[in-house]
Amino acid sequence: MIWNSKTLSAALGITISNSINCNEVQFNSKDVKKGDLFIALQGNRDGHDYVLDAIDKGAAAVIISKQVEINDKDKIILVDDCFEALQKMALYKRENSKAKFIVITGSVGKTSTKEALKVLLQHDFLVFASRGNFNNKLGMLINLASMADDTEYAIFELGMNHKGEIRELVQILKPNIAMITNISEAHLEFFNSLEEIAEAKCEIFANFSKNDIAVINADTNCYNKILSILKNLSITDIHSFGRSSKTSAELILYENLGEQVYLKYKINNKVLDVTIPFIPRHFTENYTGVLLIIDILGKDIEIAANHLANISPTKGRGEIINIQNCRVICDYYNASPQSMKAALEYLKQVPAENKTAIIGDMLELGENSKRLHEKLVQYILDAACSKVYLVGVNTKYIDDLLPSKIAKKYFKNVDELMTHITDLFEGNELILIKGSRGVKLDKIVDYYK
Protein backbone atom coordinates (compact mmCIF):
# COMPACT_ATOMS: atom_id res chain seq x y z
CA MET A 1 0.00 0.00 0.00
CA ILE A 2 1.20 3.51 -0.83
CA TRP A 3 -1.01 5.42 1.62
CA ASN A 4 -2.81 4.56 4.86
CA SER A 5 -4.74 6.51 7.49
CA LYS A 6 -1.59 7.30 9.47
CA THR A 7 0.51 8.62 6.58
CA LEU A 8 -2.41 10.56 5.08
CA SER A 9 -3.09 12.18 8.45
CA ALA A 10 0.57 13.17 8.74
CA ALA A 11 0.77 14.50 5.18
CA LEU A 12 -2.48 16.47 5.28
CA GLY A 13 -2.25 17.68 8.88
CA ILE A 14 -5.66 16.27 9.78
CA THR A 15 -6.96 13.34 11.81
CA ILE A 16 -8.33 10.39 9.81
CA SER A 17 -9.92 7.98 12.28
CA ASN A 18 -11.36 5.47 9.81
CA SER A 19 -9.14 2.72 8.39
CA ILE A 20 -7.88 3.56 4.88
CA ASN A 21 -5.33 1.75 2.72
CA CYS A 22 -4.71 3.03 -0.81
CA ASN A 23 -2.52 2.46 -3.85
CA GLU A 24 -1.83 5.04 -6.57
CA VAL A 25 -3.31 8.53 -6.57
CA GLN A 26 -5.61 9.32 -9.51
CA PHE A 27 -7.35 12.52 -10.57
CA ASN A 28 -9.07 11.05 -13.65
CA SER A 29 -11.83 8.61 -12.76
CA LYS A 30 -11.16 6.72 -16.02
CA ASP A 31 -7.75 5.69 -14.65
CA VAL A 32 -8.97 4.47 -11.28
CA LYS A 33 -8.19 0.85 -10.41
CA LYS A 34 -9.31 -1.12 -7.39
CA GLY A 35 -7.59 0.20 -4.28
CA ASP A 36 -6.57 3.58 -5.73
CA LEU A 37 -7.03 6.97 -4.08
CA PHE A 38 -9.12 9.43 -6.11
CA ILE A 39 -8.63 13.15 -5.61
CA ALA A 40 -11.33 15.50 -6.90
CA LEU A 41 -9.38 18.27 -8.58
CA GLN A 42 -10.98 21.30 -10.19
CA GLY A 43 -9.92 21.83 -13.81
CA ASN A 44 -11.87 22.12 -17.04
CA ARG A 45 -14.19 19.74 -15.23
CA ASP A 46 -14.94 19.41 -11.54
CA GLY A 47 -13.55 16.15 -10.17
CA HIS A 48 -16.37 16.07 -7.62
CA ASP A 49 -18.73 15.17 -10.47
CA TYR A 50 -16.79 11.91 -10.96
CA VAL A 51 -16.41 10.77 -7.35
CA LEU A 52 -19.18 8.17 -7.61
CA ASP A 53 -17.67 6.84 -10.84
CA ALA A 54 -14.30 6.47 -9.09
CA ILE A 55 -15.90 4.56 -6.22
CA ASP A 56 -17.74 2.29 -8.66
CA LYS A 57 -14.35 1.46 -10.19
CA GLY A 58 -12.98 0.44 -6.82
CA ALA A 59 -11.42 3.55 -5.30
CA ALA A 60 -10.46 2.79 -1.69
CA ALA A 61 -10.86 6.44 -0.69
CA VAL A 62 -11.68 9.84 -2.16
CA ILE A 63 -10.29 13.26 -1.26
CA ILE A 64 -12.94 15.95 -1.67
CA SER A 65 -13.36 19.60 -0.68
CA LYS A 66 -17.15 19.76 -0.88
CA GLN A 67 -19.89 17.38 0.10
CA VAL A 68 -20.77 14.54 -2.25
CA GLU A 69 -23.50 12.01 -1.52
CA ILE A 70 -21.64 8.75 -0.92
CA ASN A 71 -23.06 5.69 0.80
CA ASP A 72 -19.74 4.57 2.28
CA LYS A 73 -18.77 7.60 4.39
CA ASP A 74 -15.59 5.86 5.61
CA LYS A 75 -14.06 6.41 2.18
CA ILE A 76 -14.32 10.20 2.43
CA ILE A 77 -11.34 12.42 3.26
CA LEU A 78 -12.59 16.01 3.49
CA VAL A 79 -10.07 18.83 2.96
CA ASP A 80 -10.26 22.58 2.37
CA ASP A 81 -8.53 22.48 -1.03
CA CYS A 82 -7.86 19.34 -3.08
CA PHE A 83 -4.92 20.69 -5.07
CA GLU A 84 -3.27 21.94 -1.88
CA ALA A 85 -3.83 18.48 -0.40
CA LEU A 86 -2.10 16.90 -3.40
CA GLN A 87 0.89 19.22 -2.95
CA LYS A 88 1.12 18.29 0.73
CA MET A 89 1.07 14.59 -0.16
CA ALA A 90 3.83 15.03 -2.74
CA LEU A 91 5.98 17.02 -0.31
CA TYR A 92 5.46 14.38 2.38
CA LYS A 93 6.63 11.66 0.00
CA ARG A 94 9.78 13.57 -0.97
CA GLU A 95 10.66 14.56 2.58
CA ASN A 96 10.28 11.00 3.87
CA SER A 97 11.87 9.19 0.93
CA LYS A 98 15.31 7.58 1.14
CA ALA A 99 15.40 7.15 -2.65
CA LYS A 100 17.99 8.74 -4.91
CA PHE A 101 16.15 11.11 -7.27
CA ILE A 102 17.21 11.29 -10.93
CA VAL A 103 15.48 14.04 -12.91
CA ILE A 104 15.66 14.44 -16.69
CA THR A 105 14.79 17.38 -18.93
CA GLY A 106 15.56 18.42 -22.50
CA SER A 107 13.82 19.49 -25.68
CA VAL A 108 13.48 15.90 -26.92
CA GLY A 109 14.33 12.44 -25.62
CA LYS A 110 13.10 12.85 -22.04
CA THR A 111 10.65 9.96 -21.98
CA SER A 112 12.78 7.45 -23.92
CA THR A 113 15.79 8.26 -21.71
CA LYS A 114 13.74 7.89 -18.54
CA GLU A 115 12.29 4.56 -19.68
CA ALA A 116 15.75 3.26 -20.67
CA LEU A 117 17.18 4.14 -17.26
CA LYS A 118 14.22 2.44 -15.61
CA VAL A 119 14.82 -0.78 -17.58
CA LEU A 120 18.52 -0.84 -16.71
CA LEU A 121 17.96 -0.28 -12.98
CA GLN A 122 14.81 -2.25 -12.25
CA HIS A 123 16.46 -5.68 -12.53
CA ASP A 124 18.33 -5.11 -9.27
CA PHE A 125 16.56 -2.27 -7.49
CA LEU A 126 13.12 -0.95 -6.53
CA VAL A 127 12.59 1.75 -9.15
CA PHE A 128 9.80 4.28 -9.54
CA ALA A 129 9.53 6.12 -12.87
CA SER A 130 6.98 8.82 -13.56
CA ARG A 131 4.15 7.62 -15.76
CA GLY A 132 4.28 8.33 -19.51
CA ASN A 133 5.29 11.88 -20.36
CA PHE A 134 3.12 13.40 -17.63
CA ASN A 135 5.83 15.95 -16.89
CA ASN A 136 4.13 19.22 -15.92
CA LYS A 137 3.36 20.37 -12.36
CA LEU A 138 0.21 18.29 -11.98
CA GLY A 139 1.93 15.25 -13.44
CA MET A 140 4.90 15.61 -11.12
CA LEU A 141 2.67 15.95 -8.05
CA ILE A 142 0.45 12.98 -8.95
CA ASN A 143 3.48 10.82 -9.74
CA LEU A 144 5.38 11.77 -6.59
CA ALA A 145 2.29 11.20 -4.44
CA SER A 146 1.99 7.71 -6.00
CA MET A 147 5.55 6.63 -5.21
CA ALA A 148 6.04 3.65 -2.89
CA ASP A 149 7.92 4.27 0.35
CA ASP A 150 10.52 1.57 -0.33
CA THR A 151 11.61 3.07 -3.67
CA GLU A 152 15.39 3.04 -4.07
CA TYR A 153 15.64 5.06 -7.30
CA ALA A 154 13.04 7.62 -8.41
CA ILE A 155 13.23 8.77 -12.03
CA PHE A 156 11.25 11.81 -13.17
CA GLU A 157 11.10 13.76 -16.41
CA LEU A 158 10.25 17.46 -16.44
CA GLY A 159 8.90 19.42 -19.37
CA MET A 160 8.27 23.12 -19.78
CA ASN A 161 7.23 25.73 -22.29
CA HIS A 162 7.73 28.81 -20.13
CA LYS A 163 10.49 30.22 -17.95
CA GLY A 164 10.19 29.39 -14.25
CA GLU A 165 8.23 26.15 -14.59
CA ILE A 166 11.11 23.75 -13.96
CA ARG A 167 12.47 25.89 -11.11
CA GLU A 168 9.18 25.47 -9.24
CA LEU A 169 9.14 21.69 -9.74
CA VAL A 170 12.70 21.00 -8.58
CA GLN A 171 12.03 22.87 -5.35
CA ILE A 172 9.84 19.87 -4.52
CA LEU A 173 11.74 17.08 -6.29
CA LYS A 174 15.23 18.07 -5.09
CA PRO A 175 17.14 15.95 -7.66
CA ASN A 176 20.36 14.20 -6.65
CA ILE A 177 21.26 13.73 -10.32
CA ALA A 178 19.90 16.01 -13.05
CA MET A 179 20.32 15.38 -16.78
CA ILE A 180 19.78 17.56 -19.85
CA THR A 181 19.31 15.45 -22.99
CA ASN A 182 19.56 18.37 -25.45
CA ILE A 183 18.47 21.88 -26.35
CA SER A 184 16.61 22.39 -29.64
CA GLU A 185 13.96 24.57 -31.26
CA ALA A 186 10.98 23.05 -29.42
CA HIS A 187 8.73 25.74 -27.83
CA LEU A 188 10.41 28.60 -29.74
CA GLU A 189 6.99 30.25 -29.80
CA PHE A 190 7.49 31.11 -26.12
CA PHE A 191 11.21 32.03 -26.24
CA ASN A 192 13.34 34.45 -28.24
CA SER A 193 16.32 32.15 -28.74
CA LEU A 194 17.87 28.75 -28.06
CA GLU A 195 19.91 30.42 -25.31
CA GLU A 196 16.68 31.34 -23.50
CA ILE A 197 15.50 27.73 -23.79
CA ALA A 198 18.83 26.57 -22.35
CA GLU A 199 18.43 28.96 -19.42
CA ALA A 200 14.95 27.61 -18.71
CA LYS A 201 16.12 23.99 -18.91
CA CYS A 202 19.02 24.77 -16.57
CA GLU A 203 16.50 25.60 -13.86
CA ILE A 204 16.72 21.85 -13.19
CA PHE A 205 19.91 22.69 -11.26
CA ALA A 206 18.34 25.50 -9.21
CA ASN A 207 17.92 23.44 -6.04
CA PHE A 208 21.28 21.64 -6.17
CA SER A 209 23.36 20.99 -3.07
CA LYS A 210 27.14 20.49 -3.13
CA ASN A 211 26.89 16.70 -3.55
CA ASP A 212 24.44 16.73 -6.48
CA ILE A 213 25.52 15.73 -9.98
CA ALA A 214 24.89 17.28 -13.41
CA VAL A 215 24.85 15.12 -16.56
CA ILE A 216 24.94 17.01 -19.87
CA ASN A 217 24.84 16.07 -23.56
CA ALA A 218 28.03 17.65 -24.93
CA ASP A 219 26.69 17.53 -28.51
CA THR A 220 23.70 19.73 -27.80
CA ASN A 221 23.14 23.31 -28.85
CA CYS A 222 24.20 25.81 -26.17
CA TYR A 223 26.54 23.36 -24.42
CA ASN A 224 28.95 26.16 -23.47
CA LYS A 225 26.00 28.23 -22.27
CA ILE A 226 24.97 25.38 -19.97
CA LEU A 227 28.51 25.06 -18.61
CA SER A 228 28.55 28.81 -17.93
CA ILE A 229 25.29 28.57 -16.00
CA LEU A 230 26.61 25.64 -13.98
CA LYS A 231 29.75 27.63 -13.16
CA ASN A 232 27.66 30.58 -11.97
CA LEU A 233 25.72 28.17 -9.74
CA SER A 234 29.02 26.84 -8.33
CA ILE A 235 28.18 23.34 -9.54
CA THR A 236 31.38 21.39 -10.11
CA ASP A 237 30.38 17.72 -10.29
CA ILE A 238 29.63 17.73 -14.03
CA HIS A 239 29.66 14.71 -16.34
CA SER A 240 29.24 14.90 -20.13
CA PHE A 241 28.28 12.40 -22.80
CA GLY A 242 28.22 12.44 -26.58
CA ARG A 243 30.25 11.61 -29.68
CA SER A 244 33.51 13.22 -28.56
CA SER A 245 36.39 11.36 -26.92
CA LYS A 246 36.69 14.32 -24.54
CA THR A 247 33.42 13.43 -22.82
CA SER A 248 32.94 11.19 -19.77
CA ALA A 249 30.88 8.81 -21.89
CA GLU A 250 31.15 8.34 -25.65
CA LEU A 251 29.24 6.48 -28.33
CA ILE A 252 32.24 5.29 -30.35
CA LEU A 253 30.43 3.26 -33.00
CA TYR A 254 26.89 2.70 -34.27
CA GLU A 255 26.79 0.02 -36.98
CA ASN A 256 23.57 -0.92 -38.75
CA LEU A 257 23.46 -4.71 -39.19
CA GLY A 258 19.98 -4.84 -40.69
CA GLU A 259 17.72 -6.24 -38.00
CA GLN A 260 20.32 -5.46 -35.34
CA VAL A 261 22.77 -2.70 -34.46
CA TYR A 262 26.26 -3.06 -33.05
CA LEU A 263 27.17 -0.43 -30.46
CA LYS A 264 30.51 0.43 -28.91
CA TYR A 265 30.54 2.74 -25.92
CA LYS A 266 33.32 4.12 -23.75
CA ILE A 267 32.07 5.01 -20.28
CA ASN A 268 34.74 6.62 -18.09
CA ASN A 269 37.48 4.70 -19.99
CA LYS A 270 35.58 1.38 -19.85
CA VAL A 271 34.76 0.03 -23.32
CA LEU A 272 31.46 -1.79 -23.86
CA ASP A 273 30.42 -3.81 -26.92
CA VAL A 274 26.77 -4.72 -27.33
CA THR A 275 24.51 -5.94 -30.15
CA ILE A 276 20.80 -5.22 -29.79
CA PRO A 277 17.67 -5.30 -31.99
CA PHE A 278 17.64 -2.46 -34.52
CA ILE A 279 16.93 0.94 -33.03
CA PRO A 280 17.60 4.41 -34.48
CA ARG A 281 20.88 6.12 -33.73
CA HIS A 282 19.31 8.99 -31.75
CA PHE A 283 18.00 6.53 -29.16
CA THR A 284 21.44 4.96 -28.73
CA GLU A 285 23.00 8.40 -28.27
CA ASN A 286 20.76 8.98 -25.25
CA TYR A 287 21.68 5.52 -23.98
CA THR A 288 25.22 6.91 -23.64
CA GLY A 289 23.93 9.25 -20.96
CA VAL A 290 21.94 6.46 -19.33
CA LEU A 291 25.00 4.21 -19.08
CA LEU A 292 26.94 7.16 -17.68
CA ILE A 293 24.39 7.57 -14.89
CA ILE A 294 24.59 3.83 -14.14
CA ASP A 295 28.36 4.21 -13.80
CA ILE A 296 28.03 7.32 -11.62
CA LEU A 297 25.78 5.31 -9.30
CA GLY A 298 28.55 2.74 -8.95
CA LYS A 299 26.63 -0.05 -10.68
CA ASP A 300 27.99 -2.66 -13.09
CA ILE A 301 27.73 -1.07 -16.54
CA GLU A 302 28.51 -4.32 -18.37
CA ILE A 303 25.44 -5.96 -16.84
CA ALA A 304 23.44 -2.80 -17.54
CA ALA A 305 24.55 -2.72 -21.19
CA ASN A 306 23.29 -6.27 -21.66
CA HIS A 307 19.83 -5.05 -20.64
CA LEU A 308 19.77 -2.51 -23.50
CA ALA A 309 18.27 -5.26 -25.65
CA ASN A 310 15.20 -5.23 -23.38
CA ILE A 311 14.34 -1.63 -24.23
CA SER A 312 11.68 -1.05 -26.85
CA PRO A 313 10.07 2.20 -28.05
CA THR A 314 6.88 3.12 -26.22
CA LYS A 315 3.53 3.77 -27.89
CA GLY A 316 3.69 6.63 -30.37
CA ARG A 317 7.42 7.12 -29.89
CA GLY A 318 9.03 5.09 -32.65
CA GLU A 319 7.37 1.70 -32.23
CA ILE A 320 6.93 -0.30 -35.44
CA ILE A 321 3.57 -1.99 -36.02
CA ASN A 322 1.92 -3.74 -38.97
CA ILE A 323 -1.11 -2.25 -40.75
CA GLN A 324 -2.53 -3.64 -43.98
CA ASN A 325 0.73 -5.46 -44.83
CA CYS A 326 2.73 -2.29 -44.20
CA ARG A 327 5.36 -1.64 -41.57
CA VAL A 328 4.42 1.58 -39.81
CA ILE A 329 6.79 3.65 -37.67
CA CYS A 330 4.49 5.31 -35.15
CA ASP A 331 6.20 8.49 -33.95
CA TYR A 332 3.22 10.77 -33.63
CA TYR A 333 3.44 11.65 -29.95
CA ASN A 334 5.31 14.89 -30.50
CA ALA A 335 7.54 16.67 -32.98
CA SER A 336 10.27 19.29 -32.96
CA PRO A 337 12.75 20.10 -35.74
CA GLN A 338 15.37 17.88 -34.11
CA SER A 339 13.06 14.91 -33.51
CA MET A 340 11.58 15.26 -37.01
CA LYS A 341 15.07 15.14 -38.52
CA ALA A 342 15.89 12.08 -36.39
CA ALA A 343 12.67 10.32 -37.46
CA LEU A 344 13.37 10.92 -41.15
CA GLU A 345 16.93 9.67 -40.70
CA TYR A 346 15.42 6.58 -39.05
CA LEU A 347 13.23 6.11 -42.14
CA LYS A 348 16.35 6.44 -44.28
CA GLN A 349 18.20 3.78 -42.26
CA VAL A 350 15.53 1.08 -42.47
CA PRO A 351 15.75 -0.86 -45.75
CA ALA A 352 12.53 -0.87 -47.80
CA GLU A 353 11.64 -0.69 -51.48
CA ASN A 354 8.75 1.74 -51.00
CA LYS A 355 8.81 4.44 -48.34
CA THR A 356 6.02 6.83 -47.38
CA ALA A 357 6.12 9.74 -44.93
CA ILE A 358 2.98 11.09 -43.26
CA ILE A 359 4.17 14.41 -41.83
CA GLY A 360 2.14 16.60 -39.47
CA ASP A 361 2.77 20.13 -38.27
CA MET A 362 5.52 20.91 -35.78
CA LEU A 363 3.73 23.20 -33.35
CA GLU A 364 4.87 25.98 -30.98
CA LEU A 365 7.60 27.30 -33.30
CA GLY A 366 6.20 30.84 -33.59
CA GLU A 367 7.71 33.07 -36.27
CA ASN A 368 10.31 30.39 -37.05
CA SER A 369 7.69 27.93 -38.24
CA LYS A 370 8.00 28.56 -41.99
CA ARG A 371 11.80 28.33 -42.02
CA LEU A 372 11.94 25.19 -39.88
CA HIS A 373 9.25 23.37 -41.86
CA GLU A 374 10.96 24.22 -45.15
CA LYS A 375 14.17 22.79 -43.71
CA LEU A 376 12.51 19.35 -43.58
CA VAL A 377 12.33 19.10 -47.37
CA GLN A 378 15.95 17.97 -47.71
CA TYR A 379 15.51 15.32 -44.99
CA ILE A 380 12.44 13.98 -46.81
CA LEU A 381 14.42 13.79 -50.04
CA ASP A 382 17.33 12.08 -48.27
CA ALA A 383 14.94 9.45 -46.92
CA ALA A 384 14.02 8.56 -50.53
CA CYS A 385 10.27 8.74 -49.96
CA SER A 386 8.16 7.82 -52.96
CA LYS A 387 5.01 9.25 -51.35
CA VAL A 388 4.46 12.06 -48.86
CA TYR A 389 1.24 13.03 -47.10
CA LEU A 390 1.30 16.43 -45.38
CA VAL A 391 -1.13 17.32 -42.61
CA GLY A 392 -1.65 20.77 -41.10
CA VAL A 393 -1.37 24.45 -41.97
CA ASN A 394 2.41 24.64 -41.58
CA THR A 395 3.18 21.61 -43.73
CA LYS A 396 1.94 23.63 -46.73
CA TYR A 397 5.42 25.18 -46.70
CA ILE A 398 6.81 21.69 -47.38
CA ASP A 399 4.23 20.95 -50.05
CA ASP A 400 5.26 24.07 -51.97
CA LEU A 401 8.91 22.94 -52.17
CA LEU A 402 8.70 19.18 -52.74
CA PRO A 403 9.56 18.19 -56.33
CA SER A 404 6.85 16.79 -58.58
CA LYS A 405 8.64 13.42 -58.86
CA ILE A 406 7.34 12.63 -55.35
CA ALA A 407 3.69 11.63 -55.14
CA LYS A 408 2.33 14.06 -52.55
CA LYS A 409 -0.98 15.10 -51.05
CA TYR A 410 -1.73 17.97 -48.69
CA PHE A 411 -4.48 17.98 -46.06
CA LYS A 412 -5.49 20.93 -43.88
CA ASN A 413 -6.04 18.66 -40.88
CA VAL A 414 -6.17 15.01 -39.90
CA ASP A 415 -9.95 14.82 -40.30
CA GLU A 416 -9.56 15.73 -43.97
CA LEU A 417 -6.90 13.05 -44.31
CA MET A 418 -9.19 10.50 -42.63
CA THR A 419 -11.62 10.77 -45.53
CA HIS A 420 -8.85 9.18 -47.64
CA ILE A 421 -7.69 6.70 -45.00
CA THR A 422 -8.27 3.62 -47.15
CA ASP A 423 -5.88 5.01 -49.79
CA LEU A 424 -2.92 5.36 -47.42
CA PHE A 425 -1.80 1.75 -47.04
CA GLU A 426 -1.29 -0.06 -50.34
CA GLY A 427 0.82 -2.88 -48.91
CA ASN A 428 4.54 -3.69 -48.84
CA GLU A 429 5.49 -0.19 -47.73
CA LEU A 430 7.47 1.30 -44.88
CA ILE A 431 5.48 4.24 -43.52
CA LEU A 432 6.56 6.93 -41.07
CA ILE A 433 3.85 8.79 -39.14
CA LYS A 434 5.36 11.85 -37.45
CA GLY A 435 3.90 15.10 -36.14
CA SER A 436 3.08 17.11 -33.05
CA ARG A 437 0.52 15.62 -30.70
CA GLY A 438 -1.91 18.45 -31.39
CA VAL A 439 -2.20 17.31 -35.02
CA LYS A 440 -3.71 14.02 -33.75
CA LEU A 441 -2.06 11.68 -36.25
CA ASP A 442 -2.75 8.86 -33.79
CA LYS A 443 -6.24 8.78 -35.33
CA ILE A 444 -4.69 7.01 -38.33
CA VAL A 445 -3.47 4.10 -36.22
CA ASP A 446 -6.58 4.03 -34.04
CA TYR A 447 -8.71 3.57 -37.16
CA TYR A 448 -7.16 0.15 -37.75
CA LYS A 449 -7.36 -1.10 -34.16
From Swiss-Prot:
The keyword Cell wall biogenesis/degradation applies. It catalyses: D-alanyl-D-alanine + UDP-N-acetyl-alpha-D-muramoyl-L-alanyl-gamma-D-glutamyl-meso-2,6-diaminopimelate + ATP = UDP-N-acetyl-alpha-D-muramoyl-L-alanyl-gamma-D-glutamyl-meso-2,6-diaminopimeloyl-D-alanyl-D-alanine + ADP + phosphate + H(+). Gene3D superfamilies: Mur ligase, C-terminal domain (3.90.190.20), Mur-like, catalytic domain (3.40.1190.10), MurE/MurF, N-terminal domain (3.40.1390.10). NCBIfam families: murF. ATP binds at G106, S107, V108, G109, K110, T111, S112. One of its GO terms (cellular component) is cytoplasm. Its EC number is 6.3.2.10. It is an enzyme of class 6 (ligase). Involved in cell wall formation. Catalyzes the final step in the synthesis of UDP-N-acetylmuramoyl-pentapeptide, the precursor of murein. This is UDP-N-acetylmuramoyl-tripeptide--D-alanyl-D-alanine ligase. It is found in: Cytoplasm. It comes from Rickettsia montanensis. Keywords: ATP-binding, Cell cycle, Cell division, Cell shape, Cell wall biogenesis/degradation, Cytoplasm, Ligase, Nucleotide-binding, Peptidoglycan synthesis. Pathway: Cell wall biogenesis; peptidoglycan biosynthesis. One of its GO terms (molecular function) is ATP binding. Its main location: cytoplasm. SUPFAM superfamilies: MurD-like peptide ligases, catalytic domain (SSF53623), MurD-like peptide ligases, peptide-binding domain (SSF53244), MurE/MurF N-terminal domain (SSF63418). Belongs to the MurCDEF family. MurF subfamily. GO terms for biological process: cell division; cell wall organization; peptidoglycan biosynthetic process; regulation of cell shape. InterPro entries: Mur-like_cat_sf, Mur_ligase_C, Mur_ligase_C_dom_sf, Mur_ligase_cen, Mur_ligase_N, MurCDEF_CellWall_CoF430Synth, MurE/MurF_N, UDP-N-AcMur_synth.
